[in-house]
Amino acid sequence: MMSLKIQPAVPKKSDKPSATNRDCQNFKREKNNLPFQLTDKSCNLDISIRQERKKTLIFSFFSGAGFLDLGFELSGFDIAFVNEVHPPFLEAYKYSRSRMDIPKPKYGYFKGSIDECLYAEKAKDLAGWVKKEKQNGIIVGFIGGPPCPDFSIAGKNKGKDGENGKLSQSYVDLICKNQPDFFVFENVKGLYRTAKHREFFNALKRQLSDFGYVCTEKLINAIEYGVPQDRERIILVGFLSQHVDALQKFDWDAHISFPDALEKDWPTTEEVGRVVSQPANIYPELTVQYWFNRNGVDTHPNASKHFQPRAGLEKFQTISEGDDKKKSYKRLHRWRYSPTAAYGNNEVHIHPYLPRRISAAEALAIQSLPKEFELPDNMTLSNMFKTIGNGVPFLAAKGIAMTLKSYLENHYERTKTDGC
């Protein structure tokens, strides 16, 4: 049996500003708008909490461990309410925020289903909070990504009639009932590209239009925002029509950093165990190795959290580096981006040059989370990888949030007494 002791090469620098440097520049610009104190050692910035009250509050649904929410928090939004039905995910949300010194949401955490927010006692609380904030002149936004296996190619594909598919309808019903000033709806590309699911998606948009929303949508790829991952998702954004200018001014591309990411001459496969130098003419900051280095995955608190192979090491030692075309076992390439971070349905992502599955720390890096983000040590491996795989990649979430922020600042009119 051969021994794999390959050490990663150090990434070469590219002429394009790194994701780290761009984040530093954005942090400097947003220094007074962030809702918590965070020290980013890579930037040497100390970002202090803003004292005055915000003009926008976010209510989060299907929150998971809060990847989407973190993108909004680091863009200057306040999270006011968090709803998640799965207890381990909600505990991970709370834990990660406590480790990053992020304040608790104004209206707290709610462990329960979206339907409880729509019909049960919690529905009264939610309606009252939204109404009160809007009457006080606060802009209220709903964000969420309903569970998507019923629309996914890899899922059971039951569509709107599946238990998960029904949650998309519930989320839209919740929006229509509570009338937030704007909303974000995130889902898999299957909802947008598959004909029978597209019909349901269009019906949801018609319902939103009937309740006063003007909407814009885009099939995004997370890699264009700096995420080391080829991950397409449909994003639907809507605004109450009486408050907004023409949506042609909503610039989806404003915070895209790598529009030509997939056009580069990326490496394909290498014999496992070889020392592989970084190729020229790629974006190093979109590679798996760059993010492993950036996040210090070997010393991260979740570094040891990975599944042990059931059949020993032999299979892991025969799959070529970069061979990610197989249905189940996919070995990442250190100098390429990852395929979609989906760790269910018997899909196994193998470390580029070590004979094991990737760790939770490495999966978080592939989802572009800040290195300060960590999951609780007592969380099961299954729950760790499920919440990581389900989450919206952080830099994509941040790019969408920044686009929304720019639009709200420049094209949104709000009066103090409306929204009653």
From Swiss-Prot:
Keywords, alphabetical: DNA-binding, Methyltransferase, Restriction system, S-adenosyl-L-methionine, Transferase
Domain of life: Bacteria
Keyword Phosphoprotein: no
Molecular function as annotated in GO: DNA (cytosine-5-)-methyltransferase activity; DNA binding
Sequence segments annotated as region (Disordered): 1-23
EC number: 2.1.1.37
Statement: the UniProt record of this protein carries the keyword Iron: no
Residue numbers annotated as active site: 148
Enzyme class of the recorded protein, top EC level: transferase
Name of the protein: Type II methyltransferase M.NmeDI
Classification lineage: Bacteria, Pseudomonadati, Pseudomonadota, Betaproteobacteria, Neisseriales
